[in-house]
Amino acid sequence: RAKAPGVFLDFLLSWVLIPQALLPLIALLYASGIIQDEQEDQTITYLLVRPLPKWLLYIVKMIATWTTTVVLVLLLTVLTYVAIYARSNVPWADVAHRCFKTAAIQSLAVVTYCSIFGLVGLLAKRSLVIGVLYTVIVEGLLANLPLSVRMGTVIYYTRIMAFRTLDFAATWPNGDKTDVAADVWMLDVVNDPQLAEHPRLWSCVLVLSIASVVCTGVAAVLCTQREFHVKTPEKD
């Protein structure tokens, strides 16, 4: 069992702050403007003259966005774990193992967020506003309700994957033992210790992967069917 302060800080930073705030924000900033930014900067013409179909251009740009955001998430995760466990007595092999699992789960989450916000960017002009509202209402509010509606959120599946692969049980200085994740995420580990009512690990991976592919595919189709107009500068 890990010491409570380290586990609690790990949980607070890696599984509350980063997934609920930073991951959606990173994805929103990078993915929502894949096409809009090109239009506003009047650089989309340079992309459209290339001998590539629009759907393929969108997919290539989305893959580049996935790569960029995943690299950022990996760096953020590593720095977070170094800061948490730098002066602890936890073996670095255990820290590295935990960091690897956390980075893998959060990378899948940010890829899914990018796919969602990329689609939103094609459907709405005010994609940043809609993305913030989605993050606050859906991923912030609905995901924290002990109802089946939370199964429609990205963060729910990341939490289940984390709970099935990482140990959040902590022993406090007074000897009390608690599972910080189960309490905060409203998982009934007393009556359902195996979480039989929740998806299995690979089911969660499959759900998020399918969601990413579907959102990217729909966005690529929309990109193919849409005519993009660029404002030309007025002549004096």
Describe each PLM feature range.
Residues 1-10, 123, 128, 132-222:
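Terminal transmembrane helical anchor/hairpin motif
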Residues 225-236:
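Short cytosolic juxtamembrane segments of multi-pass membrane proteins
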Residues 42-43, 130:
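Transmembrane-helix signature of polytopic, membrane-embedded enzymes
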Residues 46-53:
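Short helix-to-coil transition segments within interhelical loops
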Residues 1-34, 41, 58-125, 161-164, ...:
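Secretory targeting signals
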